[in-house]
Amino acid sequence: MPAQASTTFTGADFAWPNSPGVGHLGLYIEDDISHTRLMSTVRTQTGQLCTTLDDSACANQSVRTYSILPRCETDAQKDCVESLGATTSQGAVSEGAFSRYFPESGLADFEGSPGRNIPTGAAPSIFTLPGVPHNDGNEYMVIASVNGVAPVDGVQTPSSITIHASVYPVKVLAGNFMRNTPLENGFGVSHRSSDKWGNCASIADGYCAARQDFPANTKFSLSLRLSTPPKGWLHGRIFSPTVTYEAAGSSTRLKVDATPVQVAAVATWGKYSELPEAAKSGAMNCSDTSNCGQMNPQSSGAHISVEGWRSVYGDQASWVRGQWMYQTLSEYELVGSSLAACTSGPAKFDGFITTNATGYAAGPPVFDPVGKTLSYVVAAPHTNAEGGLIVGTYDLMMRSDLAACLYGGNVSDIVASVAVVYDNATSTTTEVKTDVTNDGTWFKVSASGFHYSMPTIKTTLASKSGALPSVNSAPSIIKKSVSARALATRAQLVVSRGDVVSLRVSKAWTKKCTVVRQTLRITKTGTCRVTVRVETRKQKPRFRTMTLQVVK
């Protein structure tokens, strides 16, 4: 029998406080949990709900779909949840067993269309992990979804698709719960439960799958089979992820192994006239005589609000709870990215950013081409609700060739240093742990153990061999040859008396240019790539790779 709502975590454990009254402005920042409220739907662009893709209202319309993925039942099935597993700190591996859908079916489930690249919409899945108990059982809910837009009789394009996946430890509770109902018109839902439902990962009639605590020191693994793999960037609420991205027949298998993180929420109210100016920013039509409501900033606005309201909520979290979640960054969050010159746009999977910060900067890190630094701003309360310090985590994972392009060097040669900076001062906290790896495919940076206010995580790229960033020179007229010292000058390398300058051209470029007695000789017009090396007695050798456009 399911437990009664009074015997385990309920919505009251994470309740948004009521407004004190007129003239008060509220701030509520918690992870976007709309996926625990929504159900699979297909709608017109104006929000009209359809029962199927062939519904008369949708048949000749551009449609917007939200598909919660079913579990994979065959090897050929696409757009489905393939597996859930876990590994304990002792190395014990537990493979999850599918138990059931919860609810048994959604109120607006629909059959997908492989020809239009629209996945089938089902209900969330519950798996059991017998070897990995949480605080109240061994059931875990998986909510993996794909949503996007398909034009009239057209294919749902990769650029319109958002992929989301989350795992929750759950305990099914009996109570006065009713399934959320999709609005007939619009894009929201109607919440009909009379018991508090705020902590429900999903709701069935009479029951709530209430979120519980993750077991400590346990890594979870979720594998999805997708017809449209993620493009661009993912961001998430996990720590130390390992990503497997491979072909699985005509699908792509996306497998993410990672540890859950503890994320702080802020839920507070303040009298408008007494709020600091930074807290009032973004409030619309608010005064001491109006019902101001609450602000729910996401993405770029969240870290600014965490900082601006810090004196109001006393630098203390309203609550902290475990999260295991990732999703694709939207096109909006990628607009104006400083990485655009080196990223692949919608063509490839570029990277993954994760943090347990309450608020963080939208999009991928900001790149400074002069200092070769990648900066990412994070913000959270300093302490949890009990007064304990909140410990920060951050991971940056990107393709190695992307890191090499940003620095201007070879894929296998890129290294980095990591610093946690507070108001332009680097943290000296001994507990801060950093790690940088580059296996030639993925370049990974990790930082943990830092404390919050609103620090910037700075990753400074460098060359393992000492090579300086490459230089793309303007088209040059080179009649027959150019000396090593002349190229060193062009590469902005200082050469002193007694220094030895040498040149190297890799085999891939020898049809265009060669090195003869430390002189670059041009054999064909076009592009030539050459590495200039300056050796001195008192310093390490300096390198720089140049890409030249030459005219014979």
Task: Please annotate each region the language model reported.
Residues M1-P2:
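Hydrophobic core
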Residues N356-V415:
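Proteolytic processing hotspots in large secreted/extracellular or virion-associated proteins
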Residues T428-S473:
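Proteolytic cleavage junctions
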